[in-house]
Amino acid sequence: MPEYQTNGVRFEDLEVGQEISTMHWFVTPDDIASAAEAFYDDYPLYFDKDFAKESEWGGIIAPFYFLDATFRWVVFLSRGRMRHQCHTINAQGILESFLPIRPGDRLVGKMWVHEKFQKRGKNFLVWRMEVRNEDGELVARKFWRSYWTDREIEFPKKETYE
């Protein structure tokens, strides 16, 4: 995996079944509230302890889209600085949720190359991402199909972000 951080991700180098990344994180009440706020979702189940306590869930849970936004790390890996050197377009995504996510959950996310194919001379890749809790239970899974164009991306220099 470290070679991706220096060389970038190239379609021809990826193999079906190959594990690309793993990430561990601890879910905080602020993470959940921030996700809801980012989506302009003011449903109190995501941030009001008293309201959530009276719900069928018995406490605060993350909104269904919480992990969809979180899944972006698996491709962009902002913490590991892994980058695509090729331009890709999101062609399809299927997100399956199996268990609620609560404040205090310790999650492990992993990503693999699930499928790789050509269609009409164009390259497509399907990533499989899974998130499990500290008990090893499957919390969510996403299949994310991306179309790989022939264009290269020129990344801006760090100083352009300042």
Regions found by a protein language model. Give the residues of each.
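Hot-dog-fold acyl-thioester-processing enzymes
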Residues: 1-92, 153-162
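HotDog/MaoC-like acyl-thioester-processing domains
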Residues: 1-15, 99-162
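Short glycine/proline-centered loop/turn elements that form peptide/ligand docking sites
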Residues: 92-99
